[in-house]
Amino acid sequence: KYLNGHSDVVAGVLAGSAAHMRQVMSKELMTLGAAPSPHDAWLLMRGLRTLELRVNRSADNAEKVARFLEGHPRIKRVYWPGLESHPQHALAMRQMKRVAGLMSIELDAPDEAAVERFCDNLQRFLIAVSWGGYESLQWPVCALKGPSGYYTELPFTMIRLYIGIEDADLLIADLEQGLARM
């Protein structure tokens, strides 16, 4: 979805050993498809023209947002390898030029209701999992609760954030007001 940048095309390259590729071709071809449609290919070409600009803007915004969140008293932890406090920061800096806009945070929240208030009060973060577009997104772990409990071992206070290409100061202000209402 990063290649296209508008959350309306999924495409990529599959690479692997010859044995793995044979398995994929024999079992997954009908599910994955062999090639994009002409329209999807055109959408990808259009998106590739702005890929570098979008990725850099998202990375710039993510750094500003991560640094703001790391210093906030209502945030337990920010999981973004661009921060020096991240346990794999040194490795990330050796492997990547930039750190992308995807991060997770843990709120210092007493209960699920507080997490839901935070998420519900965000105005600039849609609830979705379609990372790589232009818009900022949130996906709270508490959304993974079914009738018999959580479908994951992750803490209910964790929220996945994708930081898009909007104005970083507006995103920070939105997060700040959401945290204040938690």
Tell what function each PLM region has.
Residues 54, 109, 136-182:
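PLP-dependent enzyme catalytic core of the Aspartate aminotransferase-like
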Residues 2-102, 106-142:
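Active-site C-terminal subdomain of aminotransferase-like
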